[in-house]
Amino acid sequence: MKIKPVVIAANSSLLCFFSTSYCLAQSTPSEFAQMSLQELFNQSIYDTEIQQGQASPWTLNYQYKTAKFEGYLDGTKSLSFNDVKGPPSNGSGKTFPVVPTTITQTAHIYSLGYQFNDQWQGHLSVPYIKQSTDHLSLVPGYSTFTIKTDGIGDAVMSASYALNSESWLLSLGISLPTGSIDEKGDTPRGPGNQQVPYTMQLGSGTYDFPVELSYQNSSAPNLSLKASATIRTGTNDRDYRLGNNYSLSGRYKVDLSSRLKGYVGLAGQYSDSIHGQDDSLLAGDPATLYPAS
């Protein structure tokens, strides 16, 4: 069963560029706020000039992302909230006593880059994340409720190397666990604030390693390909680890005229399941994972 998303992404540059994307289910805030290493290499919204008309090696990048998830799918079939909300379904996964209805994610991603030479470039990226999730519930006193979290996410340090006249680009990085995994909110599990689900935490809590290999030819028509992965290590202080992420994408662009360009692209992404569990999210007798996790 998947939540249906409505996703909008905007990249700010000297000019403003808007793009739309589609995904099948909500990602965790730390996954949502990740910026493509190729985007970091290519983007520059602030590029100071030094003497002799040469560009400064320093760049300052900003990216704004927002996503909204609403509704449920069972395969390709749309489900109403009444179809999903109900007594625990004894493991069948069809009904839940607590149901997220609308999930809104926003990320402001700030990146500082330095061009060492024609082949090497380094970046430091820090996101600020906000998330709000509306719920319906069968629990008395919690027929409707909202959980909100916001703060700094996981910082990423990365290096990019141009392999062949910038046609091939290899990028490696390390994601630092600077985002909180201890966010709390008022949930039906009990009075007061409790630990909120994995999908509301701002960071992964582990040291992770993003890697990306991309290709882009400089001649027309233009073809670009990208393969990337985020490899996660160990377990965090809450005894779990987010799953590894893998993605493949390609884009074919052609100049239809001097002012008109067209392109077609295809992308796929796969995420492993979460390893381990945060026992503070367990509720009920026998104890089961909090449904909104």
Question: Where are these predicted regions, by residue range?
Answer:
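Short sequence motifs at beta-strands and strand-loop junctions characteristic
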Residues: F96-T106, K148-G153, Q201-D208, L242-N244, ...
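Outer-membrane pore/translocation modules
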Residues: P127-R241
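Repeated loop/turn-to-beta-strand initiation elements of outer-membrane beta-barrel proteins
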Residues: W58, Q119-L124, E166-L169, P221-L225, ...
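Outer-membrane beta-barrel biogenesis signature
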Residues: A25-P88, S167, T178-D182, Y198
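Surface-exposed loop and membrane-interface regions of Gram-negative outer-membrane beta-barrel proteins
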Residues: D83-Q105, F116-V156
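Outer membrane beta-barrel transmembrane domains
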Residues: L73-T95, N236-S293
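Residues on the lipid-exposed face of transmembrane beta-strands in outer-membrane beta-barrel proteins
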Residues: I50, Y62, Y110-Y114, L124, ...
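Extracytoplasmic loops and strand-loop junctions of Gram-negative outer membrane beta-barrel proteins
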Residues: Q43-I45, P88-F96, V139-S143, N193-T199, ...
